[in-house]
UniProtKB/Swiss-Prot annotation:
Subcellular location: Cytoplasm
Gene: pgk
Binding-site list for ATP: K206, G297, E328, G358, G359, D360, S361
Keyword ATP-binding (UniProt): yes
HAMAP family, alphabetized: Phosphoglyc_kinase
UniProt name for this protein: Phosphoglycerate kinase
Pathway: Carbohydrate degradation; glycolysis; pyruvate from D-glyceraldehyde 3-phosphate: step 2/5
PROSITE patterns from the UniProt entry: PGLYCERATE_KINASE
């Protein structure tokens, strides 16, 4: 689904226009209210700067946290406005509310090239209900709409979908355009062989993705805690490892489907066990058919790392979603770090397209300092998963077709 983007609009028509830009500024804060990671803010800068440089009046709409439709002083966008002002090196004013007279007066008094941040749209319950009156009020700030919030594109909310009924044109920003190009491109027209690495602790959260990827991939590598549900389904003893007892039949079906479709499904042959769930746990490597007693698997083993690396070396496109083990514990981060390093090397030296599909795998790549070496790092968790599942994202579907 090809959508009109900001880059395809006539630059001269942006001058003096009030542009409502939906951004994803849902950043983590520490206990003293300071931003600990501004990646999402920085990801929106190309779109914001482009509008500033083309003399538009920029009005930003964003959500923060889950205030449940009520004003929550801890979820105001004050720290975001301050950080954005620093990055842009110009003052970004914040409204007291995203709609109403005060906000409208501020958006109407903007000069060309100025930026206004509307207060948290989720302070109104109408936002998540996609209420059209609320959407119309939001739209009244502007002449046109840009969605650059990939992380919220899977939500049919007033600021992602409803506003498009009142603003024309409604187009994709640079970040959203890039996300769609890589993620949609990897699914619709990848360079082959295409491999997906799916990790994480639960099969249940990745069922849709695994099922969808079996129709598209040449190889699927599975790691993380979910491997033990597959092993248990094969009748193996997994000790005290995490298992979803109600998903055993599903695991069997996924393995059978892969076999029928000729997709190479790779599970680890060895794992790193721990005697307790702790960063300082005693550990040992075990073959998957030799796990017993009180031990639990917290990472993939060295033999599996080599097998996975060899399998990935044959691929031209690789999508990674979910860690190989409990990478938050250094002792059990080897599998995840090895995959991150392998992808960085393949991307740098072999022109392999490497896509890190949101969530914990992004955190793992950033922790390893390898983010810059990947072809694309997705800013969306749930949105990435839904796109990989082949679902239509409401915030994207609402935009003007190219």
């Amino acid at each position: 689904m090809s959508k009109l983007s900001l880059s395809s609009l006539d630059k001269s028509k942006l001058e003096g226009k009030k542009v409502l830009v939906r951004v994803d500024f849902n950043v983590p804060l520490n206990d003293s209210g300071q931003i600990t990671d501004d990646t999402r803010i920085r990801a929106a800068i190309p779109t914001i700067k482009y509008l500033i440089n083309n003399s538009a009046k920029v009005i930003l709409a964003a959500h923060f946290g889950r205030p449940k439709g009520k004003v929550n002083e801890k979820m105001r966008l004050t720290p975001v406005a301050a950080r954005l002002s620093d990055i842009l090196e110009q003052k970004v004013n914040l409204t007291e509310s995203c709609i109403g007279e005060e906000a409208l007066a501020k958006s109407n008094s903007l000069n060309n090239g100025e930026v206004l941040l509307l207060e948290n749209v989720r302070f109104y319950e109408e936002e998540e209900k996609n209420d059209l009156d609320f959407a119309k009020n939001l739209a009244s700030h502007a002449d046109m709409y840009v969605n650059d919030a990939f992380g919220a594109a899977h939500r049919a909310h007033a600021s992602t979908q409803g506003v498009t009924k009142f603003l024309e044109p409604a187009v994709a920003g640079f970040l959203l355009e890039k996300e769609l190009k890589y993620l949609q491109g990897a699914i619709d027209a990848p360079k082959r062989p295409l491999a997906a690495i799916v990790g994480g602790s639960k099969v249940s959260s990745k069922i849709g993705v695994l099922d969808s990827l079996l129709d598209k991939c040449d190889k699927i590598i599975i790691g993380g805690g979910m491997i033990f549900t597959f092993y248990k389904a094969r009748g193996l003893d997994v000790g005290k490892s995490l298992v979803e007892e109600d998903k055993l039949e599903l695991a069997r079906n996924l393995e059978a489907k892969a076999k029928n479709k000729g997709v190479e499904l790779l599970l680890p042959s060895d794992v790193l066990l721990a005697n307790e769930f702790s960063p300082d746990a005693e550990s040992k490597v075990s073959q998957i058919d030799a796990i017993s007693g009180d031990w639990m698997g917290l990472d993939i083993g060295p033999q599996s790392i080599k097998v996975f690396q060899n399998a990935l070396a044959e691929c031209k496109t690789i999508i990674w979603n979910g860690p190989m083990g409990v990478f938050e514990f250094d002792k059990f981060a080897e599998g995840t770090n090895a995959i991150a390093t392998t992808l960085a090397d393949l991307s740098s030296f072999s022109e392999v397209c490497t896509i890190i599909g949101g969530g914990d795998s992004v955190a793992a790549v950033e922790k390893a300092g390898l983010a810059e070496k990947m072809s694309h790092i997705s800013t969306g968790g749930g949105a990435s998963l839904e796109l990989l599942e082949g679902k239509t994202l409401p915030g994207v579907a609402a935009l003007k077709d190219a």
